[in-house]
Every structure is written in C-alpha cells, then in structure tokens.
Amino acid sequence: MLTKFLASLAAAPLLATAWPHPSQDTFNNVTIFTPPATWTDRSTNYARTVLLNQNCEKEPYTLLSTWSESTEDGAYFPIYQSNDYGRSWDPLSKAYFTHGNFSGGAMLQPFLYEMAQPFGDYPAGTLLLTGNAIPADSSSTNIQLYSSFDKG
C-alpha cells in the first residue's frame, strides 16, 4: 500500500507537466448580447455555445453561441461568433424556422453541434442547429434541424 502511494507521488510531477496549459489568460463576465431598450420583453433564454474544431483548425479557435429570442421580427436563434477565445463576440447570422405556421410562436431549446465524422451527405465539420418551434396557439411542438457547411 505504501509503495503504491509513493509511486503515485513520484508520478504526480510528470502528470502536472503533461497537462495542457491554456494559451490565453482566463477571464469572466463577458456580455455577448444586450437586448435593445425598445424590446418589450428584454430577455433571452437557453444559451448554448460550441467550440468548432472538427477540421483541426489552428488557433485562434472559433466559438459560436446561440439562444432563444422573440422580437417584433419574429422568433429566431441568433448566431454569434468569437475568434478570440470568447473575449469579444460579433453577430454572424440568424436562423428563422419557416416550416409550418409559427407566426407569433416561440423557438426554444436551441442546440449547436459540429459533426466529428461524415454522415450521409454531411461532411465532418458540418454545423447542425436544432430547436423546438412552437406555434402561437401552442398546438404542437416541432423539433426542427438545420445544417451549415460554412460554419454558421
């Protein structure tokens, strides 16, 4: 028992030096998006983030973020992009769900996923966005899926 303990103590410095170290300093309290004061409901929900790296991109890596948003323009998932490890963010695109009659409805529970392997007609690196589209009368729940071959 003592021998195992001493062996683990001897191996600890090797593990500490082999552990990857971040190339950037850590930070906190970065605001990605602030709803305009003109919005009647100044809230967002279900924020999600994905690190893109299925094509072995070089640093700096790209982060994408999305969330649920309902505005006068309709419900959509905004896509924001960061190329500096999340220190700053810029709008990249918006995903509107257009199948069915969702006028005045809600889009909830977004999820971003970058495919690690090819599947059917989708190559590795394809970005998938899925969400729950609910019509204004709440008569159904509709899981919708969109794909992007250009990272957003």
Regions found by a protein language model. Name each.
Residues M1-H21:
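Fungal secretory targeting signals
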Residues W19-N45, V50-G105, E114-G152:
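Beta-rich carbohydrate-recognition and catalytic domains
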